[in-house]
Amino acid sequence: MAEKVNVCIVGSGNWGSAIAKIVGANAAALPEFEERVTMFVYEEMIDGKKLTEIINETHENVKYLKGHKLPTNVVAVPDLVEAAKNADILIFVVPHQFIPNFCKQLLGKIKPNAIAISLIKGFDKAEGGGIDLISHIITRHLKIPCAVLMGANLANEVAEGNFCETTIGCTDKKYGKVLRDLFQANHFRVVVVEDADAVEVCGALKNIVACGAGFVDGLKLGDNTKAAVIRLGLMEMIRFVDVFYPGSKLSTFFESCGVADLITTCYGGRNRRVSEAFVTSGKTIEELEKEMLNGQKLQGPPTAEEVNYMLKNKGLEDKFPLFTAIHKICINQLKPKDLIDCIRNHPEHMDTFIMPSPKL
């Protein structure tokens, strides 16, 4: 890496803009980082003016993080290659569907010794079947290492400066330290673990479970039912990682990227909110995205589809009844009210055992 580490944030939505507040402040304050941070912004017109111009003049992303000032050293750039070409650290924070195309644009245009970190919660379909982790796609296309950052980090709360934790999954301790320095703040505490794949899988799968929690809220089934969906969702997350990414540590699920992120998303995230409206309004997911998300995309339904694609290929749908039911509800093969029937006889309820009597 260069003596002064250059940073580029690829993405400027709600989460990208929130993380820019932390990254920009740290780049300005810490001597190892170049003060100027570039942020790739997909150009849009807002009231007749370019979004990049608004951000650079007012230091506010009025489209995706209204009311929050960005550090003045964060510079909005509408050209992806121009934003990224000098970066030593590339922070990817865009909807996962865009990553393959972005990587094609960046191939051969970035520093060969750069590193990446993905804040993207989702999977992509692999060619020939299965699922691809976003960090793997980035590494494969750009030939650079890619860490991941996942956690119970609702963007607006991070932007407000409310205390939270996050998890960085990084297999190289040397890179883990510089990434921790870049993201750590008084209100944003970072734990680095080496179990990167499990960290990333948690970040994607919890969005599926959050859709189930939203269906429960829409049906007004109460907190007990919602708690059951969250617990069964966690068990399916653990089982999924065990089947498809063996060797991961159970302890990873008890970091911020696991159970904490799952709880937060099932009570406060956009996947829960839109899924509740899906039940109560009778509108499609696509219609609700346009109405409720201000141009942003929902991650839960496409992730559920990609996971179902994998499970179906392996003949494992019946082993993951919650994931399967949520996917089928999202594509209107099942009604939301069918969710509970689908999980009533969950494998977790069948594996019963009798506890030995305690010795008195």
Swiss-Prot record:
GO terms for biological process: carbohydrate metabolic process; glycerol-3-phosphate catabolic process; glycerophospholipid metabolic process. Its main location: cytoplasm. It catalyses: sn-glycerol 3-phosphate + NAD(+) = dihydroxyacetone phosphate + NADH + H(+). Substrate binds at K121, R270, N271. NAD(+) binds at G11, S12, G13, N14, W15, G16, F98, K121, A155, R270, Q299. It is found in: Cytoplasm. One of its GO terms (molecular function) is glycerol-3-phosphate dehydrogenase (NAD+) activity. InterPro entries: 6-PGluconate_DH-like_C_sf, 6PGD_dom2, G3P_DH_NAD-dep, G3P_DH_NAD-dep_C, G3P_DH_NAD-dep_euk, G3P_DH_NAD-dep_N, NAD(P)-bd_dom_sf. Signal peptide: none annotated. Homodimer. This is Glycerol-3-phosphate dehydrogenase [NAD(+)], cytoplasmic. The gene is Gpdh1.
